[in-house]
């Protein structure tokens, strides 16, 4: 067994692992990266964020073509199969892998491909694909192994018509009807993708409202948009069993209802990738969801072992994971880059997008904060009229006495970009966080950014 010595070993090359490895390497540490795939990038690059967003982009382009009157004048609507649009995602994945591979090379991070597990608190055994075992010894270790879809034991995921959010990328045809069980972020995103391809979607939600953590007006806007685009949302439903057939799949619900479709996509929960890490060898134990507990410095109960990304739970976003990994390494090497990552904007890549940061109306009402609301509807914005993306709104919540911006919520095209203007103002200290910024700032015209000015005037005009 070959033995290699490092200052830091990072388990997992997704966003959290990458952020940790880069920060530790730039602090002068000798770093090794371990990943179970033969390519870097983690689930984010190969099965999650990148392929699903590339799929979404392709589908959005198809929708734009098929709904634009100018294109309708010169030809019939065009429809593409799921495998067709998946080809674009595969090209993006290869480009991402190449970019990330170069990052590790430039920063002299050694990458080991194989299954890593703890031998003890300072060493990791890596079983390579050829069966060779290599031992990495390090002063500090970061767990950033990510998560995978939760699979109930009573569902046969080996059936050719039953998929989860990882295996759906192997779907070789376009179903006419699809059941999506689980209406969280991933379920809603895939509902948008498949409905955009003309698939009838049954979206089964075990709650009474879509994405209940969102501002209720934004959630309602998504529900309304779904109802107009071949998505049937069924709230307050739980599965009894899933019956796989040769010609389809039947979802039996506890309410007594039955739904039949060509395929079923399971999107109900995720579990941390900790079961193969040998945590018992270092005295660590994952919770029931496979996640490990860390403190505000991202340190586990084992003093030299840290955790970051989906494997530690909330918020389970690629954007947050990268910052958590970077901060975990910052805490480890003490280079001043640590921060506790909690000011995270939400980005949901449905069609249209949703993004938000800060408090929503329910939270402010519960806290008895005297707030006011300013809105800008995209249908009145020149840029939206030019682009044809007229669905959506920007909503700003602010303190009616101090004018402090308390929350920004956006539904519509480019929402995940638009929200960052509000985020920048909300992060300003003291009186610099104010609605006055939006009315006293000249925005390029026409842009979607000027929605902030429109919403600010709308809100300030409500004051008396």
Swiss-Prot record:
Protein source organism: Pseudomonas savastanoi pv. phaseolicola (strain 1448A / Race 6)
Catalysis: reaction(s): NAD(+) + NADPH = NADH + NADP(+)
Pfam families, per database record: Pyr_redox_2 (PF07992), Pyr_redox_dim (PF02852)
GO cellular component: cytosol
Residue ranges that the Swiss-Prot or TrEMBL entry lists as coiled coil: none
UniProt cross-references to InterPro entries, sorted A to Z: Class-I_Pyr_Nuc-Dis_Oxidored, FAD/NAD-bd_sf, FAD/NAD-binding_dom, FAD/NAD-linked_Rdtase_dimer_sf, Pyr_nuc-diS_OxRdtase, Pyr_nucl-diS_OxRdtase_dimer, STH_gammaproteobact
Reported cofactor(s): FAD
Swiss-Prot/TrEMBL keywords: Cytoplasm, FAD, Flavoprotein, NAD, NADP, Oxidoreductase
Cofactor note: Binds 1 FAD per subunit.
A single GO BP: NADP metabolic process
Main location: cytoplasm
Annotated function: Conversion of NADPH, generated by peripheral catabolic pathways, to NADH, which can enter the respiratory chain for energy generation.
SUPFAM superfamilies (UniProt xref): FAD/NAD(P)-binding domain (SSF51905), FAD/NAD-linked reductases, dimerisation (C-terminal) domain (SSF55424)
Location in or out of the cell: Cytoplasm
Family of the protein in this entry: Belongs to the class-I pyridine nucleotide-disulfide oxidoreductase family.
An example molecular function term from Gene Ontology annotations: dihydrolipoyl dehydrogenase (NADH) activity
EC number(s) per entry: 1.6.1.1
Protein name, UniProt field: Soluble pyridine nucleotide transhydrogenase
PANTHER family: DISULFIDE OXIDOREDUCTASE, SOLUBLE PYRIDINE NUCLEOTIDE TRANSHYDROGENASE
């Amino acid at each position: 067994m070959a033995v290699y010595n490092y200052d830091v070993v990072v388990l997992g090359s997704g966003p959290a692992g990458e952020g940790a490895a880069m920060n530790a390497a730039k602090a002068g540490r000798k770093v090794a990266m371990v990943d179970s795939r033969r390519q870097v990038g983690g689930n984010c690059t190969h099965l999650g964020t990148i392929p699903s967003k590339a799929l979404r982009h392709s589908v959005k382009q198809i929708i734009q073509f098929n709904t634009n009157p100018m294109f309708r004048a010169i030809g019939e609507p065009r429809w593409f199969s799921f495998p067709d649009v998946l080809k674009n995602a595969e090209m993006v994945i290869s480009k991402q892998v190449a970019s990330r591979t170069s990052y590790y090379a430039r920063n002299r991070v050694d990458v080991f491909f194989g299954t890593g597990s703890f031998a003890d608190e300072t060493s990791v055994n890596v079983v390579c694909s050829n069966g060779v075992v290599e031992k990495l010894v390090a002063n500090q270790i970061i767990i950033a192994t990510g998560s995978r879809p939760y699979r109930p034991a009573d569902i046969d995921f080996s059936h050719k018509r039953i998929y989860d959010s990882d295996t759906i990328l192997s779907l070789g045809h376009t179903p006419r009807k699809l059941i999506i069980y689980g209406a969280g972020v991933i379920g809603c995103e895939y509902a948008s993708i498949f409905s955009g391809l003309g698939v009838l979607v049954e979206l089964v939600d075990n709650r009474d409202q879509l994405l209940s953590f969102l501002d209720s007006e934004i959630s309602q806007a998504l529900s309304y948009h779904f109802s107009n685009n071949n998505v049937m949302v069924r709230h307050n439903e739980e599965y009894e069993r899933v019956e796989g057939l040769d010609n389809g799949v039947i979802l039996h619900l506890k309410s007594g209802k039955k739904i039949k479709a060509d395929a079923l996509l399971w999107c109900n929960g995720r579990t941390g990738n900790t079961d193969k890490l040998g945590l018992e060898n270092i005295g660590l134990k994952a919770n029931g969801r496979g996640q490990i507990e860390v403190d505000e410095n991202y340190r586990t109960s084992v003093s030299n072992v840290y955790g970051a990304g989906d494997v530690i739970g909330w918020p389970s976003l690629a954007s947050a994971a990268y910052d958590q990994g970077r901060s975990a390494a910052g805490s480890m090497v003490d280079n001043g880059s640590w921060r506790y990552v909690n000011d995270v904007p939400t980005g949901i890549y449905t069609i249209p997008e949703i993004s938000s940061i800060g408090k929503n109306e329910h939270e402010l009402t519960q806290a008895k904060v005297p707030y006011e609301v300013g809105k800008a509807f995209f249908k009145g914005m020149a840029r939206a009229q030019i682009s044809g993306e007229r669905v959506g709104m920007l909503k700003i919540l602010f303190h009616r006495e101090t004018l402090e911006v308390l929350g920004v919520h956006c539904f519509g095209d480019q929402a995940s970009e638009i929200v960052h203007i509000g985020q920048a103002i909300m992060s300003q200290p003291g009186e610099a966080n104010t609605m006055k910024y939006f009315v006293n700032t000249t925005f390029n015209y026409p842009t979607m950014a000027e929605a902030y000015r429109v919403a600010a005037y709308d809100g300030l005009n409500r004051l008396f």
